[in-house]
Amino acid sequence: MSLGLVGRKVGMTRIFAEDGATIPVTVLDMSSNRVTQIKTAETDGYNAVQVTYGSKKASRVNKADAGHFAKAGVEAGLGLAEFALSADALSNFKPGDAIAVEIFTVGQLVDVTGTSKGKGFSGVIKRHNFSSNRASHGNSRSHNTPGSIGQAQDPGRVFPGKRMAGQYGNVKSTVQCLEIVRVDAERQLILVKGAVPGAKNGDVVVRPSVKAGA
């Protein structure tokens, strides 16, 4: 249970370490994070802080969201995210509070969640890393097919979860234990080592790494 930030993926670039080594980094814009709601165990059944970021035209905000943001006294944002916190940590926040990138430090490990790029309808070889069937020697029309998808009359059905062709990508995805290389407090940017899911300008959520003991 720890606080994170919501933002967008700007893109990838590289920076140079003091020894001249090249470090590939992803630039994340974490500006304008603000608290929209405090959820407590008494009223909501769990403790969490709800956060939004960015800005949205008033004409693009529905009445339910407009009322929600107005109640918090904040400008309408692009989306909402929640971070579970302890009751003690929750007491440090109130609706309207700003959250800056300074909650993270250089060298800290974080988990970054985004929506992966959609690849359209794909076969099992591309989607699930299946192997191709034989190129010849008795095989004439089944080179890239998945093969058998079941057994016989018993059980007489395809089991749920069977890996088959279908939509590839465009799903929520998390990359764990990415190292923060730089924190730009002036521009509210975070530079993490490596790649994160999604296309440019896609929404991302950054949390302290679970595996690092956060």
Swiss-Prot record:
<comment type="subunit">
    <text>Part of the 50S ribosomal subunit. Forms a cluster with proteins L14 and L19.</text>
</comment>
<dbReference type="GO" id="GO:0006412">
    <property type="term" value="P:translation"/>
</dbReference>
<dbReference type="Pfam" id="PF00297">
    <property type="entry name" value="Ribosomal_L3"/>
</dbReference>
<feature type="modified residue" description="N5-methylglutamine">
    <location>
        <position position="153"/>
    </location>
</feature>
<comment type="function">
    <text>One of the primary rRNA binding proteins, it binds directly near the 3'-end of the 23S rRNA, where it nucleates assembly of the 50S subunit.</text>
</comment>
<dbReference type="InterPro" id="IPR019927">
    <property type="entry name" value="Ribosomal_uL3_bac/org-type"/>
</dbReference>
<feature type="region of interest" description="Disordered">
    <location>
        <begin position="130"/>
        <end position="163"/>
    </location>
</feature>
<keyword id="KW-0488">Methylation</keyword>
<feature type="compositionally biased region" description="Polar residues">
    <location>
        <begin position="130"/>
        <end position="151"/>
    </location>
</feature>
<dbReference type="GO" id="GO:0003735">
    <property type="term" value="F:structural constituent of ribosome"/>
</dbReference>
<protein>
    <recommendedName>
        <fullName>Large ribosomal subunit protein uL3</fullName>
    </recommendedName>
</protein>
<keyword id="KW-0699">rRNA-binding</keyword>
<dbReference type="GO" id="GO:0022625">
    <property type="term" value="C:cytosolic large ribosomal subunit"/>
</dbReference>
<dbReference type="InterPro" id="IPR019926">
    <property type="entry name" value="Ribosomal_uL3_CS"/>
</dbReference>
<comment type="similarity">
    <text>Belongs to the universal ribosomal protein uL3 family.</text>
</comment>
<dbReference type="InterPro" id="IPR009000">
    <property type="entry name" value="Transl_B-barrel_sf"/>
</dbReference>
<dbReference type="GO" id="GO:0019843">
    <property type="term" value="F:rRNA binding"/>
</dbReference>
<dbReference type="InterPro" id="IPR000597">
    <property type="entry name" value="Ribosomal_uL3"/>
</dbReference>
<keyword id="KW-0694">RNA-binding</keyword>
<keyword id="KW-0689">Ribosomal protein</keyword>
<keyword id="KW-0687">Ribonucleoprotein</keyword>
